[in-house]
Amino acid sequence: MLRHGRPGSLATMSSSTLSVSVFDLFKIGIGPSSSHTVGPMIAARQFAVHLRASGLLAAVNGVTVELFGSLSATGVGHGTDRAVLLGLAGHEPDRIDPEQIAPTIAQIRSSGALALLGEHSVPFIEKDHLLFRHKSLPLHPNGMCFTA
């Protein structure tokens, strides 16, 4: 029997059968376009986690996120903007309570501040810190650049 897929994946294959878990087919996350929310939310959270793991989180005085390709072209309509804010705040797409999404986004927008991983607050004004670059990066049509 040959295992195929990411670690923890339930997809297995033998010479005559293929078993696939529903978790191999679908990603759990916010919409309306999970392809434009799940990845960006995970990437934003990983960036913040990396800052903390590197001992840099407390020294950060601001973050900027640049979106490229279709993440930029359809970002607001497909929820990429909200996904980035939630990810930076430490939320995960498969664990966030949907009832907390709107209040969390509203609080960030009204206060002009974002608590990275819920721990360290930095100024965050979307028009200045979440930038929609209407071009693609060379290695992938959907790119993101995080700067602290």
Task: Please report, for each region that a protein language model flagged, where it lies by residue.
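Fe-S-dependent hydro-lyases/dehydratases of central metabolism
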Residues: L2-H4, S9-A148
